[in-house]
Swiss-Prot record:
Protein name: Tol-Pal system protein TolB
Any one Gene Ontology BP term: protein import
HAMAP family in the cross-refs: TolB
Quaternary state and interactors: The Tol-Pal system is composed of five core proteins: the inner membrane proteins TolA, TolQ and TolR, the periplasmic protein TolB and the outer membrane protein Pal. They form a network linking the inner and outer membranes and the peptidoglycan layer.
Functional note: Part of the Tol-Pal system, which plays a role in outer membrane invagination during cell division and is important for maintaining outer membrane integrity.
Gene source species: Nitrobacter hamburgensis (strain DSM 10229 / NCIMB 13809 / X14)
Gene symbol of the encoding locus: tolB
Stretches assigned to coiled coil: none
C-alpha cells in the first residue's frame, strides 16, 4: 500500500546524496601529518579533563560572508562543548585576530590564554554561487598542523559543513569517529496531556533544522532510521489495528510493512537495510518476525507463550537483542539473527525494556524500571558490566550516537508537563537537555550522513 496523500506535498530537504553532490567529490587535504601532537583527548582514561580549544570566527572572503563565518565557528564550538571532551575558550579572551589562515598563527598568543588546540578557517563565495569552506587544526604547544581540509557546498548547507568539520576535529583529537553530522527522528508532542498531538519530526543532532514528517492526524511512535538514513520505519495508530510503516524522507511517500492480521509494532531495520524486524501480536502473545523488503517474505524468529518485542540487531547483523516476559518480568535476551535458543542477559532488580545495540557492538542500552524509578543503563552483550547512567521518575527509549559514545533518551516528569530529550555519555557524565520546539519523545539517532 502506497500512501501519497499530503505527505508528498510537504517540503523536504535534499537527500544526503544531493547534499554531498553540492560539495567537492573529495575533501582536499591541506596539510597536517598523521602523528598526534600534544593536543590529545585520552577518551578511554577515566575522568577526562576537557581540552581547552580556541575557535575564532572563520575569516570571510567578503563582508557578506562574515555572518556565515561566525555561524560556522559557533556551531563547531557548541558541538565540541556539548561533547564534554572540549572546553572552548571565550572569544573575548583572544589576543590575536585571525585574518589570514594561510599564515601560521602566533602560537605564543594562544599559549597565553591556555589554548592547547586552535581551529582557523575561511568561508569564500565562489563565482558560481557556492561556498568554499576551509579549516586548519593546530597543536598550539608544538605548532604542528594536525588537519586541514576544504569543501564546496551550496550556501544553505553551511551548518552541514560545520558539523563535518566538527567531526574532523573530534576524530583528530580523540582518535575516534565523531557524531555531529547526523540527524535525529523523534515524536513531537503538543497540546494538553489528555489530547496530545504526536507528529514525526526530524532534526539535526543539535536540535537545529526541525521539520515535520507527519501532520498529527494519527498517533505515531517508535520511529527508526534505515542504515542509509533515507527511510524511517515507525508504528502508527490509524484506522483499525496499529501498523508498521516505511516512510521515505526524500519523497514523502510511505507504505505499510506487511498487511498482517493483528497488531504489528516495534520495527527496526537490519544493518543491511534490506529487512525489517518487528513484533507481531497473535492472540495474547507477541513474537518476532523479520520481513524482506524486496520479496515481502516473512520469517518467524520466536514462538513462545510470551510477549517478545523491541528487537535490535548487533552491528554485524549476526545477533538480536530483544525484550521478553517469558520468565515473568520483562528482561533482555540475546539470540542468533535467524532465531533459535535465546540467552537471558539481565538479572538485576526490576524489569528491563527497550534494548538497543551500540554501533560499536560493545554495549546494549536499556530502560530499567524498579523502585519507582526509570533508569537508562548499559550492559555488555554477555550480561556483564551492567551500569546505570541516569535515573528519575520516567526515563525511557535510549538510542546511540553513530560512534556509540553518547546516548539520547527522553524524560517525562509527568503531570501537565511533557517529555524532553536528553543526551548522556556512556560513562554516565555530561547529561544535557536537547533543544526542541516543544515536547519530544522516542528519539532515534541516525548513522553518520557522510
Amino acid at each position: 500500500m502506497i500512501d501519497r496523500d499530503d505527505l508528498s506535498k510537504m517540503p523536504f530537504h535534499p537527500s544526503r546524496r544531493q547534499m554531498i553532490s553540492g560539495m567537492a567529490s573529495a575533501a582536499v587535504l591541506l596539510g597536517g601529518g598523521r602523528a598526534f601532537g600534544q593536543a590529545r583527548v585520552q577518551i578511554d582514561q577515566g575522568n577526562v579533563a576537557p581540552l581547552p580549544i580556541a575557535i575564532p570566527n572563520f575569516v570571510a572572503g567578503s563582508p557578506s560572508d562574515s555572518e556565515v563565518g561566525a555561524g560556522v565557528a559557533k556551531v563547531i564550538t557548541n558541538n565540541l562543548k556539548r561533547s564534554g571532551l572540549f572546553a572552548p575558550i571565550d572569544q573575548a579572551a583572544y589576543i590575536e585576530k585571525i585574518t589570514n589562515i594561510d599564515v601560521p598563527p602566533q602560537f605564543a598568543n594562544w599559549k597565553t590564554i591556555n589554548a592547547q588546540a586552535l581551529v582557523t578557517g575561511r568561508m569564500t563565495r565562489q563565482g558560481d554561487g557556492r561556498l568554499k569552506a576551509e579549516f586548519r587544526l593546530w597543536d598550539v604547544a608544538t605548532g604542528q598542523q594536525l588537519a586541514g581540509q576544504q569543501y564546496f557546498t551550496s550556501p544553505e548547507y553551511w551548518r552541514r559543513i560545520a558539523h563535518i568539520i566538527s567531526d574532523q576535529i573530534y576524530e583528530r583529537l580523540t582518535g575516534e569517529k565523531g557524531y555531529f553530522d547526523s540527524r535525529v527522528v523523534f515524536v513531537d508532542e503538543s497540546g494538553a496531556a489528555q489530547h496530545r498531538i504526536k507528529r514525526l519530526a526530524l532534526m539535526d543532532q543539535d536540535g537545529a533544522n526541525v521539520r515535520y514528517l507527519t501532520r498529527g492526524a494519527d498517533l505515531v511512535i517508535t520511529p527508526r532510521f534505515s542504515p542509509s538514513t533515507q527511510e524511517i520505519t515507525y508504528m502508527e495508530f490509524g484506522q483499525g489495528d496499529p501498523r508498521v510503516y516505511l516512510f521515505n524522507i526524500e519523497t514523502g511517500q510511505r507504505e505499510i510493512v506487511g498487511n498482517f492480521p493483528g497488531m504489528s509494532f516495534s520495527p527496526r531495520f537490519a544493518p543491511d537495510g534490506q529487512r525489517i524486524i518487528m513484533s507481531l501480536q497473535q492472540g495474547g502473545n507477541s513474537n518476532l518476525f523479520v520481513m524482506d523488503l524486496r520479496s515481502k517474505s516473512t520469517t518467524r524468529l520466536t514462538d513462545t507463550p510470551a510477549i517478545d518485542t523491541s528487537p535490535s540487531y548487533s552491528p554485524d547483523g549476526g545477533r538480536i537483542c530483544f525484550e521478553s516476559d517469558r520468565g515473568g518480568r520483562p528482561q533482555i535476551y540475546v539470540m542468533g539473527a535467524t532465531g533459535g535458543a535465546a540467552q537471558r542477559i539481565s538479572f538485576g532488580e526490576g524489569s528491563y525494556s527497550t534494548p538497543v545495540w551500540s554501533p560499536r557492538g560493545d554495549y546494549i542500552a536499556f530502560t530499567k524500571q524498579g523502585g519507582g524509578q526509570f533508569s537508562i543503563g548499559i550492559i555488555k552483550p554477555d550480561g556483564s558490566g551492567e551500569r546505570i547512567l541516569t535515573s528519575g521518575f520516567h526515563n525511557e527509549g535510549p538510542t546511540f550516537a553513530p560512534n556509540g559514545r553518547v546516548l539520547m533518551f527522553f524524560r517525562d516528569p509527568g503531570g501537565n508537563s511533557g517529555p524532553s530529550l536528553y543526551t548522556i555519555d556512556v560513562s554516565g557524565r555530561n547529561e544535557l537537555k536537547v533543544p526542541t520546539p516543544g515536547f519530544a519523545s522516542d528519539p532515534a539517532w541516525s548513522p553518520l550522513l557522510s
